[in-house]
């Protein structure tokens, strides 16, 4: 009996570990990767993108992300989209929000970006009542 309980406990711990490593992105990941409010000030858009991609830890293990979007709004404006929504629901803001697209222009020797600023509607993916994925932006 004790061996059986130990076996099931080990299986449960393994399942939890795997789900944490390969599971759904978290709200904290979403905020770190896509929300910059209030917008951090830099002398130009290229400097903004180059510093923010490093500061937020978006490029890891020598890999440069080809495109990343930062949304410059209070996170609560995005959180409200996911209230009472099922997991994996995609929701789009009705209003346009300020966003910055950071696009990779060179990957060696270091990641280098250029940027563009827009006012776009923002589509997010929801999980657990919170945004966890930026699905895109639209004029």
Curated annotation (Swiss-Prot):
Signal peptide: 1-21
Keyword terms: Angiogenesis, Cytoplasm, Developmental protein, Differentiation, Disulfide bond, Endonuclease, Hydrolase, Nuclease, Nucleus, Protein synthesis inhibitor, Secreted, Signal, Stress response
Record: active site: 34 (proton acceptor), 133 (proton donor)
Protein family (similarity comment): Belongs to the pancreatic ribonuclease family.
Primary location class: secreted
UniProt: tRNA binding residues: 102, 122
Protein name, entry field: Angiogenin
Regions annotated as coiled coil: none
GO biological process entries: angiogenesis; defense response to Gram-positive bacterium; hematopoietic stem cell proliferation; negative regulation of apoptotic process; negative regulation of translation in response to stress; stress granule assembly
The EC number(s) this enzyme carries: 3.1.27.-
Gene label: ANG
Keyword Disulfide bond: yes
Domain of life: Eukaryota
Pfam families linked to this entry: RnaseA
Function: Secreted ribonuclease that can either promote or restrict cell proliferation of target cells, depending on the context. Endocytosed in target cells via its receptor PLXNB2 and translocates to the cytoplasm or nucleus. Under stress conditions, localizes to the cytoplasm and promotes the assembly of stress granules (SGs): specifically cleaves a subset of tRNAs within anticodon loops to produce tRNA-derived stress-induced fragments (tiRNAs), resulting in translation repression and inhibition of cell proliferation. tiRNas also prevent formation of apoptosome, thereby promoting cell survival.
GO MF annotations, alphabetized: endonuclease activity; nucleic acid binding; protein homodimerization activity; RNA nuclease activity; tRNA-specific ribonuclease activity
Disulfide bridges in this chain: 49-102, 64-111, 82-126
């Amino acid at each position: 009996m004790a061996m059986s309980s130990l076996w099931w406990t080990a299986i449960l711990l393994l399942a939890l570990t795997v789900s944490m490593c390969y599971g759904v992105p978290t709200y904290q990941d979403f905020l770190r990767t896509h929300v910059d409010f209030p917008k951090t000030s830099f002398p130009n858009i290229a400097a903004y993108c180059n510093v923010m991609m490093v500061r937020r830890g978006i490029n890891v293990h020598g890999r440069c992300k080809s495109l990343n979007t930062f949304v410059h709004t209070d996170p609560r404006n995005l959180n409200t989209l996911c209230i009472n929504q099922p997991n994996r629901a995609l929701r789009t803001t009705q209003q346009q929000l300020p966003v910055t697209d950071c696009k990779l222009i060179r990957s060696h020797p270091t990641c280098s970006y250029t940027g563009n600023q827009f006012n776009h509607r923002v589509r997010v993916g929801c999980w657990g009542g919170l945004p966890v994925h930026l699905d895109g932006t639209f004029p």
